[in-house]
Regions:
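Cytosolic covalent-transfer regions centered on His/Cys nucleophiles
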Residues: 1-160
Length: 160
């Protein structure tokens, strides 16, 4: 479940006034650094990829999913979320971001279920609006938990 990865330790809110896109990725990564999920080299890898490839991590209006190839800097699958009250330009003003996800993968497959659940969360415009209007970590977690519940119910129905 998404809430196993996105919880009170890995979800944060910042005003964003003093952040640029690199600092936003670093701030979003902090919980994963603090709990040993990733090492600093992974944060550098995520920034390097954006510098080389452009804003490909901009996966939808106001949403970025920072990630890099699985490498020796990831100890286990992890995800973190930073919501900024102010929009931050990801490489240019054409890519304004408020919702910064960080995904850490140890291989090419172990994170796929998490991606599927994240897709369920972010493809519903109502969920995105709720994330944007959230004023607390608790508000953000409630949106995520609600999606988890709906996802679990759907899986049970699909098995019938």
């Amino acid at each position: 479940m998404l809430s196993n990865l996105l919880n009170e330790k890995t979800v944060r809110i910042a005003d964003g006034k003093k952040l640029d896109w690199k600092t936003s990725i670093k701030e979003a990564s902090k919980p994963l650094l603090e709990d040993g999920t990733i090492l600093n080299g992974y944060v550098s890898s995520m920034i390097d990829v954006v510098e080389k490839e452009g804003p490909y991590i901009n996966i939808g209006p106001v949403i970025a999913l920072a990630h890099a190839q699985p490498n020796g800097f990831v100890n286990r699958v992890g995800m973190a979320l930073l919501k900024t009250k102010d929009s931050i330009a990801l490489t240019s003003k054409d890519h304004m971001i408020n919702i910064w996800f960080v995904l850490a993968a140890v291989d090419s497959n172990s994170h796929l279920e998490s991606i599927k659940e994240l897709t369920k969360l972010l493809t519903d415009p109502n969920n995105v609006e709720k994330l944007l209007s959230a004023n607390s970590v608790c508000d953000l977690l409630n949106v995520i938990k609600n999606v988890d519940l709906n996802f679990a119910v759907k899986r049970k129905e699909d098995k019938k």
